[in-house]
């Protein structure tokens, strides 16, 4: 059984029950979210282990996050409670102003999650992992969180990184500079990205050209293409898996579902093509409900989907 450790901010998500502008929405659902937490749960659903290094506030939302993730099987022993700052929250506006798309409105400045620091990274714990994962979000939330990622990556035997650029957290110029700096310092086993992020980082949105440039930094590259599917590049090879047409409730977390499922199935010994096909299903199921983690499927559930559904 493989073990993944992630570093990042855990957030509480308030997802609008009805589509449209938030000024007219009265009711919301509460969910535990955050990219690295989503990766953890997706990884566990395929029969592997995951722990997360993170901070939450000494508040009801923080305890909600700990209890929920523990219930999903996540090792929360390195989640710390910070009494000096609140757990970050965000609201999701769905299907407005663009149908089938979601917008996140964050209230996370000065959050407990942003106070993650190198002191929170235990060397022996990181050494116990087969793979250590983080994202551009963690680089962006604070300088100390970025330093925590650097420390963990220095220790890690294998590294995974999702570019996950959020322009509400930093400018395109800063994102490009900091991500290229990290890529130049640490060779990755996995780089997970998309064409929008590739355009910011490399000035190139063509998937094949971007993957060729990224191959200097990573062994395996997963290029997410939204509803069109995804491509995996490895050993000079390329495999494309198309998406499925399903009713879309909320696309938030779909990329994390894909990435976390793919990583886990790779460590289960799946061939790249099969791992990506299954990961596409996980991403597809994720967009059909509200919440980032509740619809993450097991391997058995994915296989049931594949028997019944056609692309």
Curated annotation (Swiss-Prot):
Keywords: ATP-binding, Carbohydrate metabolism, Kinase, Nucleotide-binding, Transferase. The active site is at 256 (proton acceptor). It catalyses: 2-dehydro-3-deoxy-D-gluconate + ATP = 2-dehydro-3-deoxy-6-phospho-D-gluconate + ADP + H(+). It comes from the Archaea. The keyword Kinase applies. Substrate binds at residues 34-35, 106-108, 166, 253, 256, 292. InterPro entries: KDG_KDGal_kin (IPR054939), PfkB_Carbo_kinase (IPR050306), PfkB_dom (IPR011611), Ribokinase-like (IPR029056). Optimum temperature is 80 degrees Celsius. Extremely thermostable. Gene3D superfamilies: 3.40.1190.20. GO terms for molecular function: 2-dehydro-3-deoxygluconokinase activity; ATP binding. Its cofactor is a divalent metal cation. Its EC number is 2.7.1.45. Optimum pH is around 8.5. SUPFAM superfamilies: Ribokinase-like (SSF53613). Pathway: Carbohydrate acid metabolism; 2-dehydro-3-deoxy-D-gluconate degradation; D-glyceraldehyde 3-phosphate and pyruvate from 2-dehydro-3-deoxy-D-gluconate: step 1/2. It is an enzyme of class 2 (transferase). It holds the Pfam family PfkB. Mg(2+) is the most effective ion, but it can be replaced with Co(2+), Ni(2+), Zn(2+) or Mn(2+). ATP binds at residues 164-166, 224-229, 253-256, 283. Homotetramer. Involved in the degradation of glucose via the semi-phosphorylative Entner-Doudoroff pathway. Catalyzes the phosphorylation of 2-keto-3-deoxygluconate (KDG) to produce 2-keto-3-deoxy-6-phosphogluconate (KDPG). Can also use GTP, but not ADP or AMP, as a phosphoryl donor and 2-keto-D-gluconate (KG) as a phosphoryl acceptor. Belongs to the carbohydrate kinase PfkB family. This is 2-dehydro-3-deoxygluconokinase. The lineage of its organism: Archaea, Thermoproteota, Thermoprotei, Sulfolobales, Sulfolobaceae.
